[in-house]
A protein has these predicted regions:
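Acidic, glycine-rich A-domain
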Residues: 1-188
Length: 188
């Protein structure tokens, strides 16, 4: 047993998809209870929300679309990760109490907006999207070791707050055209 739980850390992964709209407020309240517990017993935590919306589209100073950079090298037999996928780090134990409270109030307001279908209350690029749960779980292979190292932790637990099934994951597949050209496509 580790004294006082000082060598433990928690990562929360929140489903930021459209199907969560009716339960987002209750889910957010439960998340806040978990965060207050972590704060009280000094357990470091990070909260990520997975989405395809945040990184969806930006525009440059000339109002031309800027497409997101791919997250990885696309090659045969690798899983397809949507170019718009993002893990938004929305809360962290690094925040002081004032900043944490302000962020939690903002997230509560956004979640309330989802339940009442008041989309105008949702900040730009914070709307709900599809369900890139598989991509989120894959990204944890980088997030968890970095979190563990940052806080010199022995144990890191991950809690996923979701309402269910992930969007399907495709894989890259090389396709040879009749003229001999090889192209990279996708396949389920």
């Amino acid at each position: 047993m580790i004294p006082e739980g000082k060598n433990h850390g928690l990562i929360f992964v929140l489903d930021w998809s459209g199907s969560m709209s009716s339960v987002m407020l209750d889910t957010m309240k439960q998340l806040f209870n978990l965060i207050w517990f972590c704060r009280k017993v000094s357990i470091p935590f990070d909260v990520f929300a997975f989405t395809n919306e945040y990184n969806y589209m930006t525009w440059d100073e000339n109002d031309k679309p800027v497409y997101p950079e791919p997250h990885y090298e696309k090659k045969d037999a690798t899983l397809v990760v949507n170019d718009h996928f993002s893990m938004m780090n929305i809360l962290t134990s690094n925040f002081n109490n004032r900043v944490l409270e302000k962020q939690m109030k903002s997230l509560h307001r956004i979640a309330f907006g989802f339940t009442k279908y008041v989309e105008y209350s949702v900040p730009n690029r914070m709307g709900l999207s599809g369900t890139p749960l598989n991509e989120a779980l894959i990204s944890l292979h980088n997030i968890i070791p970095a979190f563990k190292k940052q806080y010199s932790l022995e144990k890191v637990q991950c809690i996923v707050l979701t309402d269910g099934e992930a969007a399907p994951c495709n894989r890259h597949s090389e396709v040879t055209y009749p003229n001999g050209e090889v192209h990279l496509g996708t396949q389920r």
